[in-house]
Amino acid sequence: MAAKGRMRRIIRTARSLPTALERLIVVLEHRYTPIARFRPGAFEGWGFLWQPAVLGFIALLLILAGSCFVESPFKLGLPRTWFFGAPPSLAATNLPTNETKLMIAISLTYGGLVLLLRVWMRLAEVVKLHAGAPDRVLYCIVALWSIPMLVAPPLFSRDVYSYAAQGEMTAHGISPYIMGPFSLGSSPFVDPVDPLWGNTPAPYGPLFLYLDGLIVRSTHHNQLMSTVGLRLLELAAVALLAYALPRLARALGRDGGEAIVLGALNPLVILTLIGGAHNDALMVALLVAGLMFAARRQLWLALLFCSLATAIKAPAALGLVYVAWTWLVPGANERVTRVREFPIVVVRMIRTRLRPLVAGAVMSTVTLLICTYLAGFGFGWVKNLATPGTVRSWAAPATALGMAITGLCHSVGLDVSMTPILSVTRLLGLLTAVGISIFLLWRAQTRGWVRSLGMSLLLFVVLGPVVQPWYLVWGLLVLAASYQGREHFWLLALSITSPFLGLPGAHDLLDGLVNAPLLLMAAALIVLMGALLVPLGRWTQWSWPEVDDRLERLGLTAE
C-alpha cells in the first residue's frame, strides 16, 4: 500500500509540473518584461501581421549579419564554401582570430536568435487565441523570413557539405553505403566535410541519394553550386510543408493558420531546415503530405507519400505504420474489458486491419524498390541507420545516463569502458520508446492518430542515442497540426529551447564580454539586452487575454 501511495504521489507531481512551469513563466514575465503594462483589449483583425513579419525579418537579418564575419563560429570558416564570409585562402585560416569581430558576430547572432524566438512565441499565442489567420498572408511571412537564410551560408551544422560529397560519390558510381566522403580523395567536395563523418557510410534512403546525385550532376560537379542546389531542394520541401500543414489541421478540425505558425514559421524550421539545409525538411514535408491525404481518406496517395518520406530517412516509416493501422473498416475498434478477451480482440482487429496492412506493405515495398533501383546502390542504408549514434552528447538522456554512470564508476576507482554501458542505456531508451509507441498506436483511435504519431516521433528522438535540434522537427511539425491542451506549452518550450542545443559561441561571448574594451562591451550588451527586452508592439496584448485571471490566481495584479 505504501508503494502504491508513493507511486500516486509521483504521478500527481509529474502531472502538476506543466502547471508549475507555466505559473513560473507568468510571474517572471509579469515582473521582468514589458508585458506587465499591457491590458487585454478587443481583437482588431489581422492587419497587424506586418509587425511580427518585419520584426522576425529584422531578427533574421541580425543572424545573417553575424554570419558575414569570417570569425563567426556558426558557419564553416574555409575558403570557397560560400559567396561571402569565407577566408580568401587556406593560409588565412591559420591567422590569429580577431576577437572584436568574433564578439560582434556572436552578439548579432545571439541577439537575432533571441528576438526571433520572442516574436514567434507571441505570434503563436495570438493565432492560438484568435483563429482564422489568412493563409496567404502567413505564406508571405514564410517567404520573407526565408530570404535571409537563403542568403546566409549554411549555419549551425556542416551536414549539407556531407550531402554534397555523397552526391558527388553517387554521380561517380561510388556507393555512399560502403564508403565515406573521404574516398573522393583530393576532390573539393572533401574539404568542408566534418572529419567525424569523413569515413562514415550514409544512413540516408535511396531517394535522397538519387536527388543528391542529380543535383551534383546538374551543377556540373561544382561544390558551391551543389550546396546551393541542396538548400533550394530543402526550401521546396518547406514550401510543401507550408501547403500540407494547414490542410492537415483543417481535416482534423483545427485552425490552419495556427498550424502554419507553429510549423512552417517555427524557428527550428527557418534556422535548421532552411539555414542548415538538412534533409529532414524533405522527409517531414513528404510525411505531413501523406498524413494530409490520410486524413482525407485518400489512402493510396497517403501510402505513396509516406513511402517516399521513408526513402529519404527511415524514421518516416512510423508514419506508414500509423496510416495502415488506422485505416479501419466499420467496427474495427474494440475495447478489452477482461484479460481473457485480449487474444480474441487482437485476432479480430488484425483481421479487420489485414487489408490496409497488406496494402501498406505492398505500396511501400514497391515504392522503396523503385527508389532503390533509381539510386542503384541497394539496401545498404538499412545497416547504416545507427550511424548518428557515433556522436556522444549530453543532450540525449539515454547517452547522458551512460556517460554519467561511466563517470561515476571512474570516480570510485572502477575501470569500466563507456561503450558497453552506452549500449545498455541506449537499448533501454529505445525499448522504452518502442513500448510507449505501441501503447500510443493501440490507443490511436481514441487519442487521435496524428497526435499519437507526433508523440511517437518525439519519443524516438528524445530517447534515442543522439538528439539534434533538426531531429525534433519530426514530431513537432506533426503535433503543430494535431496537439491538444497543454501539449501547446511543451511544443513552444521545445521549439524555443532546442535551437540552443550545442550552439557554439557561448563561451567566446562570455569571455569577450569580460575582456573586451568598455565601448565594445557596451555595444554588445545593448544588442543582447535590446533583443531580450525591447517592446514588440501593442499587438502582443492580444496574445494575453487571460493574463489578468492567471495573475489574480497567483496573487499578483496587472498594473
Regions found by a protein language model. Name each.
Residues 240-244, 283-298, 457:
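Specific aromatic-rich, kink-prone transmembrane helix
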Residues 131-231, 235:
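Intramembrane catalytic core of multi-pass membrane enzymes that act on lipidic substrates
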Residues 1-61, 89-148, 445, 450-451, ...:
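Start-transfer (signal-anchor) and selected internal transmembrane alpha helices
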Residues 132-140, 245-267:
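Transmembrane-helix signature of polytopic, membrane-embedded enzymes
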Residues 318-365:
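Perimembrane helix-loop-helix junctions
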Residues 483-559:
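Aromatic-enriched
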Residues 111-122, 228-252, 284-285, 435-441:
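Transmembrane-helix motifs of polytopic, lipid-linked glycan transferases
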